[in-house]
Amino acid sequence: MQEFTNPFPIGSSSLIHCMTNEISCEMLANGILALGCKPVMADDPREVLDFTKQSQALFINLGHLSAEKEKAIRIAASYAAQVCLPMVVDAVGVTASSIRKSLVRDLLDYRPTVLKGNMSEIRSLVGLKHHGVGVDASAKDQETEDLLQVLKDWCQTYHGMSFLVTGPKDLVVSKNQVAVLGNGCAELDWITGTGDLVGALTAVFLSQGKTGFEASCLAVSYLNIAAEKIVVQGMGLEEFRYQVLNQLSLLRRDENWLDTIKGEVYE
């Protein structure tokens, strides 16, 4: 798509601080390395500030929350807001947990660059009817007409923030633009951690100076296109998971990968 510029080669090996869960941390670390940056995962309140100060972007994922981790998240987010460090917040599980929803709404005061979630999570967060269960989106929540206007209003309230809403069609919404993106394959939903990986890749592109809108579009499209290249080969899920990381490192060598992004951008 002509709207975006190729982020590769990565200009500097940025340090990406991921506050994520134990299930997906290895995939995120390897995905960040595959793009040419460096990961760090620190969620102890006693040291989290030290690592955040050294980082070029912060990714907060609520996939495995505890009281101690919440304390660390608040410390890191507060610092990020003070120094304008690019920050991605992944609102995992807000459909099921009032604690998580309350935390995400508090984090909005720190003006994250990108707020990410699946369709049910984002509908729940902004006060729309939803049918999500646990951390999964519902097929009943894929209607976007009512959601888009609410998200635009939120972007006006939280100036500078973009929404990344994942689903069969991925939505990226900023104050002035909307992208509806169509790459991807069903197999990505069959292995754990791929949604978390999108958030981490968004942080990578933010560390390279991309806006929240562009970083979100690039991240979700990059992973989806990598997966499309694999699924045509036909393989089991464990091999598919391995090849996702493999393709992430290979796709960046393709100078024309942006041409394979499916979707539209609207002003």
Curated annotation (Swiss-Prot):
Q: In which pathway does it act?
A: Cofactor biosynthesis; thiamine diphosphate biosynthesis; 4-methyl-5-(2-phosphoethyl)-thiazole from 5-(2-hydroxyethyl)-4-methylthiazole: step 1/1
The family database entries (InterPro entries) matched by this protein are listed as: Hyethyz_kinase, Ribokinase-like
Positions contributing to substrate binding = M41, G193
Annotated keywords: ATP-binding, Kinase, Magnesium, Metal-binding, Nucleotide-binding, Thiamine biosynthesis, Transferase
Instruction: List this protein's GO terms for biological process.
Output: thiamine biosynthetic process; thiamine diphosphate biosynthetic process
Q: Which domain of life is it from?
A: Bacteria
| GO MF term list | ATP binding; hydroxyethylthiazole kinase activity; magnesium ion binding
Protein name in UniProt? Hydroxyethylthiazole kinase 2
Q: Which organism is it from?
A: Streptococcus pneumoniae serotype 19F (strain G54)
Lineage per the UniProt record: Bacteria, Bacillati, Bacillota, Bacilli, Lactobacillales
